[in-house]
Structures are given as C-alpha cells and as structure tokens.
Amino acid sequence: MSEKHYAIVLDTGKCLNCKACTVACKFENNVPVGDEAYRLWVTEMPLQGRFPHLHQEYQPSQCQHCRNAPCQAVCPTRATYTTSDGMVLVDYNKCILCKACMLACPYDARFVSLQHGAVEKCTMCIHRVREGREPACVETCPTKVRVFGDLNDPSSQASRLLASREWFRLKEDRNTKPRLYYLR
C-alpha cells in the first residue's frame, strides 16, 4: 500500500465566519486564548454584488503544509521537517527562534510561541490523525467547510471532491505546492 498523502479541501462558500475552527484549534492545541497567535484564521473577502444584493465570502487559512516548503528549506537547525504523510511540523527542541521560517513563509502562517520557546504553526492535529481522528478544525466546523483526507485514496471524500470540482491553491506562483485545496 502506498504512503498516505494528507490534505485539506476547503469549500469556502460554506464558511459563515463563525470562528468555531479557530476556537477548536486554540483549545485542542493549548494556544492561549486572546493571544494574537493563531494556527488558523478566517479572512473576510471583499463584498461582492450591488446593494441590496450583496454577498460576503470568507477564506479560512492556515499553514498550507507545502510539498516544497520554503520554511523548511531555510531552517538552519532542521527544526522544520515534513513527515512521510505530508505534514510540515516543527521540532520545538531544535528551534533557535531565528525566525527565518517566519520570513520565508508566503502564507504568514507561523508565530512565536512563548509557551514552547519556539516558532509554532498548524500541525494538522497530527496527534489526532495518528489516533484515526480528524483535525479539530475539520471535526468542529458546523457547515463542513473543511474536508480532511488521504489523496492517495481515490475513495476518500477529499479525493472525490478534487476529482469532481474545480479547485485552486493559494499563491501557486510561489511553487510551494500546498496541501490545502480551495474549491471554486
């Protein structure tokens, strides 16, 4: 059997900006509440249409878990690494807080964690995934914006969505090859 290739597929048209994903992430990963440090966030996109027919969309985002991760390439201590199934992680014990990875990340998805004394980012809830569970942001979303799955499994919901819908990845011109896919 081939290795797993985890990814998250996002249907942003379903996002209500309820922040359940952000709260679940902070709680699951012990990120201090109220702190400006976020492993994921939701951006309000510009209003579309004309009054009275206006439409608001939101774009959830987080670390893109890139196949060609610039943060990993610049890390002098190799604290940033990629697991065999595609998750880009940080070994807090190796991080020297040089912040080179923060500067290299085109998605602005890293922050300094005083709790860990290291740069921190989304882990795609690897601890949950290893237990056979979904990341907290995926599980908690009331409108099911995020779908987590193994793209090497053609029967996974994530694979089926990508096969049946048009999609894009953020900042594709940077050649980072993100593992987050946004449905059109």
Predicted regions located by residue number:
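Non-ligating segments of multi-cofactor redox enzymes
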Residues: 1-184
